[in-house]
Amino acid sequence: MAIESSPPFLVGQDGLKGYKLRTCTIIGGRGFQGRSLVSCLLLLNDWNIRIADSDPSLVLDPTELVLVDALNSRRISYHQLNRLDSSLLLETIGSSSAVFFVDFPCLKNLEFVELHEIIVEGTKNVIAACRECQVRQLIFISSADVVFDGSHSILNGSESLPYQIRHGDILMDLKAQAESLVLCANNIDNLLTCVLRPSTVFGPGDPDIIPFLMCSVKYGLAKFIVGDGENTSDFVYCENVSHAVICVVKALDYRMTSVAGKAFFITNLEPFPFWKFVSLMLEGLGYQRPIIKIPATLVWYALLISKCMQINISTSARLFHLATRTRTLNCSSAQNQIHYEPVVSMEDGIRMTIQSFLHTEQNAAFSEMEEHSKAAKLLGSGKVADILLWRDERNTFVCFLVVFSLLYFLFLSGRTFASSFPIRIRYFG
């Protein structure tokens, strides 16, 4: 197995003249953030890129035609990867000077044991493979959620914040363990490691925020503001996260001791009102801004009921916490130590995200209208139909409040049936 003992220095946009291109492996390269990183590295002309992911083969979207030339010139290659297969990891990573651990495979509907195996054990295997293959740099993309408990706001938080145990979000607990493993592996067998913690990533292909908003539109819930609507969040456009990865590589090349073994928050450096972000996205996609404020407690009880009904609410719960708490982060460490500055503003990022989803959403809108028309035919007209189909928003909202109030008093408040009886008398006369 050929090993690069020391990588050549990075150069500018014109590529390397007289030097062999560096080889990197992007684990999770077909995920949301991985695709962005591949595109950014291609523009540098400094890298041969190995895309490693769980899919059996590389299937390009119509928007990825730029990758065809790179595949033909062999600047890009695809490798199916199982993080639990050590021999496959060694084969994929071998001769790479840098490994970018960007994402995990789809983790929906998996049990704790499976999640732990993929995230924690998989990360251990990646680290071991990097050490055996004498990889120089391992950069892990984590999440700012690892220090956010969901119950308390964070104002200008720094990387010194401790990990938070979130019993309702096993995924983030396990990701915090994986992050810790990467940081602890620094400077063992000459491997330099670094962790990036982006805060609420968005962009073309976003698998969480935009699909969640579209689901809310579909079920008539996008008109609601949860809580007082005054909270502020830090977001980051996906291309800025990719740029931060490149900044870390350069920093590790030239200033190893100040960056290696550390974690850095990555944001757009533009704290943004959360509900303004939601409103701009919905308006850009052709929908009405949310205008009706509902108590956060009410929505939380609805999520608890969904959980009791064994409905997967992990994404909903995570976005609920973001929607009702302020979370702003201090990126001065990233600015000072890896010289990170966003290359795409919030305004441009929102605009490009909307444009990327418009075509998809136009197709989805037709299906949505069909569903509503079938429901309308089934329910017909009348008071009940008007309430269920959100034709009368005021009456629907009142019924919504009454139903959840009854659920709380009769089932969620901890009262017995007998102690709830006076309450029922009071409410029903």
Question: Which residue stretches match the model-derived regions?
Answer:
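Membrane-interface amphipathic segments
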Residues: 369-429
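Conserved Rossmann-fold NAD(P)-dependent oxidoreductase catalytic core, especially the SDR/UDP-sugar
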Residues: 121, 125-173
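Amphipathic terminal alpha-helices
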Residues: 2-17, 23, 333-336, 345-369
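NAD(P)H-binding glycine-rich loop region in Rossmannoid oxidoreductase-like domains
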Residues: 72-121, 129, 133, 146-150
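N-terminal Rossmann/SDR dinucleotide-binding element
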Residues: 1-98
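Active-site Tyr-X1-5-Lys
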Residues: 166-194
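NAD(P)-dependent short-chain dehydrogenase/reductase
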Residues: 185-251, 281
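Mid/C-terminal beta-alpha module of Rossmann-like enzyme folds, strongest
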Residues: 251-315, 352, 361-368
